[in-house]
A protein has these predicted regions:
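Short acidic, Gly/Pro-enriched loop/turn segments at secondary-structure junctions
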Residues: 132-134
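Short acidic capping loops at alpha-helix termini that bridge into adjacent secondary structure
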Residues: 119-122
């Protein structure tokens, strides 16, 4: 299972699922802070018993500063391939009060499927709110959860 969370701040672009979403706030992070891709990569790496994205793409590295998370996703797929695995499917949930994610889900699926080299039907993405509860409900951040099925 993968999980990630990033704080919403002014002055940053909002990248989720590999696409830029128009919004007055963006996610703060060392890379582009794509919370969905980060959760998916953690799920994929975890399924292969290969630790997490922080281990492979540390936020202390100059190489990952401002990195496009689609590169992290591409490289994660290459990493699991070194152990003979390939991705079967992903099931992910984005938790955000605003902006509404549902209109963007098909573009996210298409974008990530192209990076991974799979059919968009293998990338399940759902969106929910926290009914105005917690940091997500107060629009202080966005989180994402993911599980991945891999096979040899």
């Amino acid at each position: 299972m993968g999980y990630d969370v990033h704080q919403l701040v002014a002055g940053r672009d909002l990248w989720i699922g590999g696409i830029k979403i128009e919004h007055e706030l963006g996610l703060l992070g060392h890379s582009d802070a794509d919370v969905l891709i980060h959760a998916i990569c953690d799920a994929i790496l975890g399924a292969a018993n290969m630790r997490d994205i922080g281990y492979h793409f540390p936020d202390t590295s100059a190489e990952t500063d401002g990195m496009d998370s689609k590169i992290i996703l591409r490289d994660t797929i290459a990493l699991i391939a070194t152990k003979g695995y390939h991705l079967v499917n992903v099931d992910a949930t984005i938790c955000a009060e605003r902006p509404k994610m549902n209109p963007h889900i098909p573009a996210m699926q298409q974008c990530m499927a192209e990076v991974i080299g799979t059919d968009p039907d293998n990338i399940s993405i759902k969106a929910t709110t926290t009914e105005k509860l917690g940091f997500t409900g107060r629009q202080e951040g966005i989180s994402a959860y993911a599980v991945a099925l891999i096979e040899k």
